[in-house]
């Protein structure tokens, strides 16, 4: 028996599939089978492999043109081949296993595409493991594969009687456990690309994005550095970013556009009375300019009333009463502002005395000034100014937004109709400003917005991602450029998966990291995955002529 054992061949480690097939003699059977993964992380994976039975050894390759085997093992010591009913699933309907006489040796699992294929493979394996036991075991005719199923499997699955002691524990079997480390960058030969774009099932424990689990893996610095940046702004930024463009950007444009219009009435109407009543012109004009502005705008409201109906007497009487009320408010406000600022103390008495004159002056030329001041109420930024002091307090201190905060409540309480009218008209003025500023600020805001959580898919399998993509469309036709980011099946990095409508399949791009920079190809480096994704929204992906990132998976809002 020992002499027989010496004749068991040892699998060759560096031989291509085609070389093995063309070797004279020895090849019993060759074809594609699904092989179960060998490590704990690959137990649920059944990648398709090109399997060759050659001289009592089994080799499996990634494809029929691979230059070297993915793994190989000798059938020495294996004494039984059986159906693997426990491994039967909807994807693996015809599995079988090759069992060693020693429980310390690995049991190999394969899955055929049909019942006849399984019978054929099991018959050939049975014949190979019984090669040196033909005198004890009847040779099995492969033609039995078409015979009765029970009788066939009964003969094939019967164990071969061999001695355990004659099979040493050390052998020359080997297997590359990085068998699923193949991420094809499609249609382009390159150093990073392996021979096939097979997809692999899900069984990678850590989820893709959540922060709590990532720190547990100390050996994943780049994944941690990537995810630690994105979750922190995920919750806070969306509310401010939705609020800021409405409150911040629109008032800035409104103020830029309205600043000139506000200066014009301030110069035309109140400028001459200031010179008469306020001799010092050093820093006083800026203060009364803002003080008189609210009062003057209130006088514009009565000015609008006589202009629209065209009645002079009633409008003058109502406007005078409004002028008295507003002048009192202005007196209080001016005394408050003067007391807070402190430089001029002699101004409060003359200013209220002149205030009714300003109002009358504004009322007398109402027919002529109506054309000038008619656009002022709709353009006056009453609603936004309430929100502006927060950003504008530091940006434009010279405009003195603080005095405007205090008169606003009084002015809004006294003429509710006028304020509501300005509110409606200002909504019309705010919409174009939002559209204009949205284009300018969108790039800056987008750089700060992290990728949505839905982009990160908790799977290591491309076919699972393809299933998710097809589920987004009732007809099973995903949008071109639909993309997500999944985990790598064996590495600690990420994989960008993109739906290519032209070829009707997903494309896988490994996301590499070097010196805290991310890239798909070495020529273009990015500081973060988000900036890389943004880049490929406008630039064609590597190894493709027209594929762009267009639609993040699971994100319904605008980009």
Swiss-Prot record:
Annotated ranges, domain PH: 26-130
Modifications after synthesis and translation: Phosphorylated. Phosphorylation at Tyr-446 may stimulate the activity of the LYN kinase.
Pro residues bias (residue ranges): 202-213, 233-242, 375-386
InterPro entries: PH-like_dom_sf (IPR011993), PH_domain (IPR001849), SH2 (IPR000980), SH2_dom_sf (IPR036860), SH3BP2 (IPR035848), SH3BP2_SH2 (IPR035847)
Residue segments, region Disordered: 164-449
Residue numbers bearing the Phosphoserine modification: 277, 414, 425
Biased composition (Basic and acidic residues): 252-265, 360-371
Annotated SMART domains: PH, SH2
An individual GO BP term: signal transduction
Function: Binds differentially to the SH3 domains of certain proteins of signal transduction pathways. Binds to phosphatidylinositols; linking the hemopoietic tyrosine kinase fes to the cytoplasmic membrane in a phosphorylation dependent mechanism.
Protein name per UniProt: SH3 domain-binding protein 2
Source organism per UniProt: Mus musculus
Lineage of the organism: Eukaryota, Metazoa, Chordata, Craniata, Vertebrata
